[in-house]
Amino acid sequence: DQPRSRGLGDVYKRQELELYIHIPFCVRKCSYCDFLSAPATEQTREAYMAALFAEIGGRAKDYSDRTVTSIFIGGGTPSLLSGEQIGQLMDRIREQFAMAQDAEITMEVNPGTVSAEKLRNFYTAGINRLSIGMQSAQAEELKNLGRIHDFEGFCQVYREAVEAGFTNINVDIMSGLPGQTLASYRDTLEKVLHLEPMPQHISAYSLIVEEGTPFAAMAERGELPLP
């Protein structure tokens, strides 16, 4: 028999399912970010979580024959949620979906929004991979990006994440930043490589000046000193 080529129907028939869950809350908007996010009160967060739980229930019915092998909780800043809220979210997913025993469950974490206790609660809830938004080790570059942390704050979160039990950690860094040089980028990369233990993954992104962001407005005025 000739091997049958795979069509679109084969894709829909596969049994694995990957979930992306968006948490659209931030302390403040970074200068480069065009993702859906905004500040929120506790009431807003609770209302969003209630709506999210309802959507999970509805979506689960559509994929009752699938097994979840991967979950990515992104944003926004998911780590603005409490450990209890993340625990409730994971409980709801496990109640509604069939989960693979080795499912990778990633959550984005921003320094300045977590404590050692909160990280332990995330780990207990079932999060088994963290993606920490470092972006740069340089104070001026972080300031230009509108980030709320410094390198020391990142190092504290990284250390506390390891102490909480996380053994699978990704670190985000960015290139092409305002005021960045090859030397400063190399210094950032070397600092990441010298973390103990070294992160299991490093995601290196190049800055894209997106329409509608503060960086785009600065670029139009000729005020964005890109390398």
Question: What is the meaning of each model-derived region?
Answer:
Residues 24-35:
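Local cysteine-cluster metal-coordination motifs and their immediate loop/turn environment
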Residues 19-22:
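Short active-site neighborhood of thiol/selenol oxidoreductases, capturing the structured segment around
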